[in-house]
Swiss-Prot record:
Protein name according to UniProt: Copper transport protein CCH
One GO CC annotation: chloroplast
Pfam families: HMA
Residues the record lists as N-acetylalanine modifications: A2
Biased composition range(s): Basic and acidic residues: 73-121
Length: 121
């Protein structure tokens, strides 16, 4: 059964759009999809399960959530004529670079482990 899945995806550049385009282009059951970087909105149509689409797009490393239902009920403005389906032209190495996640950990010393100096008398 064909259905439409709408996601909010954190995309800030054409590289982000390319990563989402790549994974959706390979996904089985997808008939069409639209990527709107301005609204950070991805609309997927086809014989797909919403959770499967969500998981597939999440694999790009982009922050992904379901599009809010109340926003979907609002009347839609005319589609931007400049929005088009983007074809993948990046090399595999460039794509892998985009998928890397910055893994900086915030490390704070615990109060009990804080360095103390003996008082001088």
């Amino acid at each position: 059964m064909a259905q439409t899945v709408v996601l909010k995806v954190g995309m800030s550049c054409q590289g982000c759009v390319g990563a989402v385009n790549r994974v959706l282009g390979k996904m089985e059951g997808v008939e069409s999809f639209d990527i709107d970087i301005k609204e950070q909105k991805v609309t997927v149509k086809g014989n797909v399960e919403p959770e499967a689409v969500f998981q597939t797009v999440s694999k790009t490393g982009k922050k992904t959530s379901y599009w809010p239902v109340e926003a979907e009920a609002e009347p839609k403005a005319e589609a931007d004529p400049k929005v088009e389906t983007v074809t993948e032209t990046k090399t595999e190495a460039e794509t892998k670079t985009e998928a890397k996640v910055d893994a900086k950990a915030d490390v704070e010393p615990k109060a009990a482990e804080a360095e103390t100096k003996p008082s001088q008398v």
